[in-house]
Amino acid sequence: MAAELYPASINTNLPNSNSTAVTAASKKTIVQVTQTVTTPTTTATQQNINNNNVETASWQSTHPTLRERNALMFNNELMADVHFVVGPPGASQKVPAHKYVLAVGSSVFGAMFYGDLAEGESEIHIPDVEPAAFLILLKYMYSDEIELEADTVLATLYAAKKYIVPALAKACVTFLETSLEAKNACVLLSQSRLFEEPELTLRCWEVIDAQAELALHSEGFCEIDLQTLEIILKRETLNTREAVVFQAALDWAVAECKRQGLGPTARNKRAVLGKALYLVRIPTMTLEEFANGAAQSDVLTLEETHDVFLWYTAANKPKLEFPLQKRKGLTPQRCHRFQSSAYRSNQWRYRGRCDSIQFAVDKRIFIAGLGLYGSSGGKAEYSVKIELKRQGVTLAQNLTKFISDGSSNTFSVWFEHPVQVEQDTFYTVSAVLDGNELSYFGQEGMTEVQCGKVTFQFQCSSDSTNGTGVQGGQIPELVFYA
């Protein structure tokens, strides 16, 4: 009778290969990740082909290193003394292997084949691991090569955890951290908790907090489990409006109704949300947001809707089950690159020209906006287009206005959403102002600025056509979250 091997402690509720959990699936990304571990020589497609191409009886002499000879045995029937039937019934794949190689690479396999309770079965069923992930695991154990792809990395992490292969697990986590963005952060949060990867969990929270609106509007948010939903809705540092949180909860409820085979009626949405609904801080919405959104959703009872309206308007406020305190969100930090500001006649003037500067940071941050100088001649309004680019590619831009009061203070202008900025890479920020008034400008600029735990470096930008550079000019501040 064939043996069956199930995980001892890890939940098998994994996303399938079509999950949206990881979306950075370009081949370039894969190569970059594998280079930090080893040099790949076999593609993922080739891994599904038996390696039974031993040319001659003296094949050992043509493969001089132990690593080459071992690699040749990967997925090879030659001398195989065990077979695995990997994957669920109907979608399984038979994989040949060699007990000794597996045992020296994994304590789980060591105990399985050579421990006190070793089984003598020649065919072992592993229904909870995807075949592609199992082949990646075996390839690493035979050759030290790791090649990860977006659609299999979570399943590979599961396999690496199950068979206690920490180097492969670490490579998977690194890949996930590299590909982490707002649209997959919520799904990866649920998986990082499942796999007990605290560093990945922390990175997910950084993205979800700073880019909360993007994360909550993503398709991936609707795929999370109820427990992860509740954890996110409790989050004090979500940096978004409560109306966005409420709508995200409704979107999740619609998806959950479909998963449970229910129609997305108001009653069913309320039922699948359960107590999670009371984690939304409805009273912290503006009256207009509540009246045009939650009050018309039909998810709240008539009594709840009535009481919330009274809470907004009545002196004697009713007791509500919803939290009353506004979320703290994130406090924006400001990197100021000038030591002083000044004003001289005929400077700083705007004629539709671009003020621009390049910067790099030593840790990942989220750029939320820019601080700009305003008029030196009293109150004035400026139209401004701000832009953030990396290697010539526009990552974010916004066309807006700001009013200055005649002081030398900086005035914040914001991108629509905070933008993730990676470490050790130069980015370009630009501002094109339109206004008749002369403005203040910065001087005694610094090439390096320490701002909290983040170090900024500045250099001149070739895009700057209005005089701004490292030593002086516009764009005195970068506004960011870290």
UniProtKB/Swiss-Prot annotation:
Residues 80-150 form the BTB domain. SMART domains: BACK, BTB. In embryos, expressed in the cranial ganglia. One of its GO terms (biological process) is neurogenesis. It comes from the Eukaryota. Its main location: cytoplasm. One of its GO terms (cellular component) is nucleus. Keywords: Cytoplasm, Developmental protein, Differentiation, Neurogenesis, Nucleus, Ubl conjugation pathway. InterPro entries: BACK (IPR011705), BTB/POZ_dom (IPR000210), BTB_POZ_BTBD6 (IPR049738), PHR (IPR012983), PHR_sf (IPR038648), SKP1/BTB/POZ_sf (IPR011333). It is found in: Cytoplasm; Nucleus. Pfam families: BACK, BTB, PHR. Interacts with cul3. Interacts (via BTB domain) with zbtb16/plzf. Adapter protein for the cul3 E3 ubiquitin-protein ligase complex. Promotes the export of zbtb16/plzf from the nucleus to the cytoplasm and targets zbtb16/plzf for ubiquitination and degradation. Up-regulates neurog1 expression and antagonizes zbtb16/plzf, to promote neurogenesis. PANTHER family: BTB/POZ DOMAIN-CONTAINING, BTB_POZ DOMAIN-CONTAINING PROTEIN 6. This is BTB/POZ domain-containing protein 6-B. It comes from Danio rerio.
